[in-house]
């Protein structure tokens, strides 16, 4: 009888990088569906175009590096980057805006660092910040929620055949920032604003964030991500908002508004949880995410941008190695958490 032997590892797991990435993509579908329900087909068009741009950009760069294109594209990391950036863009974004952001994210923020696992910053957020700084008007033109455009209208916006000026309006966070900077009562003005209609996070936006919350809980249930970063993120955003609101409810927005408006849930469950650029230890993840949440609240409340998920995530990506150094667990057999010391 002949015995067939193979090299280790002999114990394997069903999941691989591609399988994990596909689960992340599936988890974004509820959020994409609600964005389509509230704003029309613009987000779907953005995501599909972003995926095409990401795959082509990655394939061209892999070919230039002499790498196996099919092998590396199967990990779906480029698709995840494209989906997240496509979801973050306004549904009014023209085709060239997505092209610039996604190609920069894949080529500069990911491949120039060596590819998957080497990038110190979240590629999707690098692309987003580039667009926000370079094209601020195009990046802040959102449609009024609850009045979705048809597929034809969305396509005309995407191709530049339909002007966006008469269709776009301020988001709830834009309204809050304007009211806050003017020194008016956020409680009164936000409640009476035509977009809000008394909703706790702005008409439509609470549903968008609830959908991404549902997708995030799915990722936790499938053990794709752990609870540490989402919990720290939401606590860091919600607790300062609660404290400020209790002190001065006229000036500061309440915590529900902060948690369920803008990209809060997308950031908490899909962006800050990037395993490559985030902190790695359990305590480090909590500290990392807590600081992201606090920074988002500070920039939203006192800064010049209505939302701040991208800036906050990138700043804490930069700090992640420092956080890991001081929060690494104690190695078994050592008294100190610093490896190699007794």
From Swiss-Prot:
<keyword id="KW-0472">Membrane</keyword>
<protein>
    <recommendedName>
        <fullName>Ion-translocating oxidoreductase complex subunit D</fullName>
        <ecNumber>7.-.-.-</ecNumber>
    </recommendedName>
</protein>
<feature type="transmembrane region" description="Helical">
    <location>
        <begin position="252"/>
        <end position="272"/>
    </location>
</feature>
<dbReference type="GO" id="GO:0005886">
    <property type="term" value="C:plasma membrane"/>
</dbReference>
<keyword id="KW-0597">Phosphoprotein</keyword>
<keyword id="KW-1278">Translocase</keyword>
<feature type="transmembrane region" description="Helical">
    <location>
        <begin position="42"/>
        <end position="62"/>
    </location>
</feature>
<feature type="modified residue" description="FMN phosphoryl threonine">
    <location>
        <position position="171"/>
    </location>
</feature>
<keyword id="KW-0813">Transport</keyword>
<dbReference type="InterPro" id="IPR004338">
    <property type="entry name" value="NqrB/RnfD"/>
</dbReference>
<comment type="similarity">
    <text>Belongs to the NqrB/RnfD family.</text>
</comment>
<dbReference type="InterPro" id="IPR011303">
    <property type="entry name" value="RnfD_bac"/>
</dbReference>
<comment type="subunit">
    <text>The complex is composed of six subunits: RnfA, RnfB, RnfC, RnfD, RnfE and RnfG.</text>
</comment>
<keyword id="KW-1003">Cell membrane</keyword>
<feature type="transmembrane region" description="Helical">
    <location>
        <begin position="68"/>
        <end position="90"/>
    </location>
</feature>
<keyword id="KW-1133">Transmembrane helix</keyword>
<keyword id="KW-0285">Flavoprotein</keyword>
<keyword id="KW-0812">Transmembrane</keyword>
<feature type="transmembrane region" description="Helical">
    <location>
        <begin position="200"/>
        <end position="220"/>
    </location>
</feature>
<comment type="function">
    <text>Part of a membrane-bound complex that couples electron transfer with translocation of ions across the membrane.</text>
</comment>
<dbReference type="GO" id="GO:0022900">
    <property type="term" value="P:electron transport chain"/>
</dbReference>
<keyword id="KW-0288">FMN</keyword>
<dbReference type="Pfam" id="PF03116">
    <property type="entry name" value="NQR2_RnfD_RnfE"/>
</dbReference>
<feature type="transmembrane region" description="Helical">
    <location>
        <begin position="286"/>
        <end position="306"/>
    </location>
</feature>
<feature type="transmembrane region" description="Helical">
    <location>
        <begin position="227"/>
        <end position="247"/>
    </location>
</feature>
<keyword id="KW-0997">Cell inner membrane</keyword>
<dbReference type="GO" id="GO:0055085">
    <property type="term" value="P:transmembrane transport"/>
</dbReference>
<keyword id="KW-0249">Electron transport</keyword>
<feature type="transmembrane region" description="Helical">
    <location>
        <begin position="124"/>
        <end position="144"/>
    </location>
</feature>
<feature type="transmembrane region" description="Helical">
    <location>
        <begin position="308"/>
        <end position="328"/>
    </location>
</feature>
């Amino acid at each position: 009888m002949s015995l067939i032997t193979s090299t280790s590892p002999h114990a394997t797991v069903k999941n691989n990088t591609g399988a994990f990435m596909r689960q992340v993509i599936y988890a974004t579908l509820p959020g994409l569906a609600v964005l389509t329900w509230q704003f029309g087909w613009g987000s779907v068009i953005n995501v599909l175009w972003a995926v095409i741009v990401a795959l082509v950009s990655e394939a061209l760069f892999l070919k230039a590096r002499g790498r196996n294109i099919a092998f590396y594209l199967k990990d779906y990391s480029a698709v995840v980057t494209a989906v997240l950036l496509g979801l973050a863009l306004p549904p009014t974004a023209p085709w060239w805006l997505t092209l610039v952001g996604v190609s920069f994210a894949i080529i500069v923020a990911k491949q120039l660092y060596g590819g998957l696992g080497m990038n110190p910053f979240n590629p999707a957020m690098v692309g987003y910040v580039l667009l926000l700084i370079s094209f601020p008007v195009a990046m802040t033109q959102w449609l009024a929620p609850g009045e979705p455009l048809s597929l034809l209208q969305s396509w005309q916006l995407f191709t530049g055949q339909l002007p966006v000026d008469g269709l776009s309006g301020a988001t709830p966070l834009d309204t809050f920032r304007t009211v806050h900077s003017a020194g008016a009562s956020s409680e009164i003005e936000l409640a009476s604003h035509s977009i809000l209609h008394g909703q706790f996070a702005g008409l439509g936006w609470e549903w968008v964030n609830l959908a991404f919350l549902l997708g995030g809980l799915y990722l936790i249930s499938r053990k794709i991500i752990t609870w540490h970063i989402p919990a720290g993120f939401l606590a860091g955003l919600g607790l300062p908002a609660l404290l400020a609101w209790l002190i001065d409810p006229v000036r500061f927005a309440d915590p529900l508004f902060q948690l369920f408006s803008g990209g809060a849930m997308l950031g908490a469950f899909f962006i800050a949880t990037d395993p490559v650029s985030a902190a790695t230890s359990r305590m480090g993840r909590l500290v990392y995410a807590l600081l992201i949440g606090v920074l988002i609240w500070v920039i939203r409340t006192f800064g010049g941008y209505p939302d701040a998920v991208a800036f906050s995530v990138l700043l804490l990506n930069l700090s992640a190695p420092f956080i890991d150094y001081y929060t690494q667990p104690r190695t078994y057999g050592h008294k100190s958490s610093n490896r190699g010391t007794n």
